[in-house]
């Protein structure tokens, strides 16, 4: 009987070891896939604009995968893939028109600051994180969607998004944000 109990104990010990090893390895792999690159800039922007740092990381993760030299086919630049026209407009909004050129968007510190400022602008303008994320991708057309009962039942929340690219984008950002919270900002990490 003690031999059978010993075998059960050994199997349980192996199971506990493998489970721990698997969880530890999975956590490390997840953190490699969801890094906290540019943490100084992200944490500063989160504080300055009262944004969840997990949201900023999620936008960067989705937009550029943290590549400071990223440039889209339509001309969006930097880690937060900001359009030069938006960057110029934001400089005017902040009273520093012409301080930077569009190539300054390749500087992660500048791009994260202005990208986060834009995200906060949309959050304040629309009042919900989901609408702010959609607007970060599609712009002020979100106003039309919120005023259309096909897309918003209450005029405040998007029930659906008519642009498949934007809907996919919002889903990716929300999923990435959940991972950042799980990996870095939850009590269990």
Each PLM stretch: what is its role?
Residues 20-189:
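Catalytic glycan-binding domains that act on GlcNAc-containing polysaccharides
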Residues 1-5, 9:
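Single conserved hydrophobic/aromatic residue that forms the stacking wall/gate
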Residues 9-12, 173:
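Intrinsically disordered low-complexity regions specifically enriched for long asparagine
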Residues 11-21:
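Hydrophobic alpha-helical membrane-insertion segments, chiefly the h-region
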């Amino acid at each position: 009987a003690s031999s059978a109990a010993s075998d059960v104990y050994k199997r349980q010990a192996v199971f506990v070891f493998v489970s721990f090893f698997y969880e530890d390895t999975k956590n490390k792999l997840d953190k490699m896939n969801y890094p906290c690159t540019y943490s100084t800039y992200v944490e500063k922007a989160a504080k300055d604009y009262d944004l969840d740092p997990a949201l900023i990381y999620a936008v960067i993760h989705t937009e550029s995968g943290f590549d400071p030299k990223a440039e889209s086919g339509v001309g969006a630049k930097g880690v937060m893939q900001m359009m030069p026209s938006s960057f110029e407009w934001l400089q005017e909004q902040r009273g520093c028109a012409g301080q930077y050129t569009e190539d300054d968007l390749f500087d992660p510190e500048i791009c994260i600051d202005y990208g986060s400022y834009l995200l906060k602008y949309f959050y304040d303008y629309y009042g919900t994180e989901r609408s702010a994320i959609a607007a970060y991708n599609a712009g002020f057309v979100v106003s039309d969607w919120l005023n259309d009962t096909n897309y918003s039942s209450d005029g405040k929340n998007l029930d659906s998004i008519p642009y498949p690219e934007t809907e996919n984008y919002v889903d990716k950002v929300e999923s990435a944000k959940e991972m950042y919270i799980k990996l870095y900002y939850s009590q269990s990490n």
